Amino acid sequence: MFNRAVSRLSRKRPPSDIHDSDGSSSSSHQSLKSTAKWAASLENLLEDPEGVKRFREFLKKEFSEENVLFWLACEDFKKMQDKTQMQEKAKEIYMTFLSSKASSQVNVEGQSRLNEKILEEPHPLMFQKLQDQIFNLMKYDSYSRFLKSDLFLKHKRTEEEEEDLPDAQTAAKRASRIYNT
């Protein structure tokens, strides 16, 4: 089972992460460590599924996970093509995050809240202004605290430790971490 986990892990990594240009294997010469990417910008963090997972864990502890969930829901919404699906998703976003009765209400300016009537004619950018507000809230508030958090620093230390391990040990350690979390 352990060998299958390592094998699956290896298959998921892009070829550029597995071999250098000379064909030699290198775990310590990854393009850029994930924590370094995350620390570079909130955008980088939100583009990385592992980064989103860690950021959500942090926000959950801070009782503000709804911010990243709203941001992600808006990103999904912008990619939708089907009008009926857009209407359903728009109503879901509104009821979950924006209405006065929302279960996970986000903190946006009062005038920025959408009127329910606008949900009947959705368009991909209808939540953009609100999404930008939440992004900036995360960027200038939660994100900076995340970069100083034990959660982030622990992940960074783990990456640094793995950098010093031979390839087989690194893959085994990653597989162990993935299947034990």
Curated annotation (Swiss-Prot):
Q: Which Gene Ontology molecular-function terms are recorded?
A: G-protein alpha-subunit binding; GTPase activator activity; GTPase activity
Compartments (UniProt record): Nucleus
- Residues with S-palmitoyl cysteine lipidation? C74
Q: Which Pfam families match?
A: RGS
Query: What protein name does the entry list?
Result: Regulator of G-protein signaling 10
Q: Which CDD domains match?
A: RGS_RGS10 (cd08741)
Q: Where is it mainly found?
A: nucleus
Under the heading InterPro entries, the entry gives: RGS, RGS10/12/14-like, RGS10_RGS, RGS_sf, RGS_subdom1/3, RGS_subdomain_2
A GO term from the CC aspect: cytosol
Q: Please list the GO biological process terms of this entry.
A: G protein-coupled acetylcholine receptor signaling pathway; G protein-coupled receptor signaling pathway; negative regulation of signal transduction; positive regulation of GTPase activity; regulation of G protein-coupled receptor signaling pathway
Q: How does it assemble?
A: Interacts with GNAZ, GNAI1 and GNAI3. Associates specifically with the activated, GTP-bound forms of GNAZ and GNAI3.
The Low complexity compositionally biased stretches are 23-32
Residue intervals of the RGS domain: 41-156
Q: Which SUPFAM superfamilies match?
A: Regulator of G-protein signaling, RGS
- The superkingdom of the source organism is Eukaryota
Q: Which UniProt keywords apply?
A: Cytoplasm, GTPase activation, Lipoprotein, Nucleus, Palmitate, Phosphoprotein, Signal transduction inhibitor
Phosphoserine modified-residue sites: S24, S41, S176
User: What is the stated purpose of this protein?
Assistant: Regulates G protein-coupled receptor signaling cascades, including signaling downstream of the muscarinic acetylcholine receptor CHRM2. Inhibits signal transduction by increasing the GTPase activity of G protein alpha subunits, thereby driving them into their inactive GDP-bound form. Modulates the activity of potassium channels that are activated in response to CHRM2 signaling. Activity on GNAZ is inhibited by palmitoylation of the G-protein.
Annotated segments matching region Disordered? 1-32, 158-181
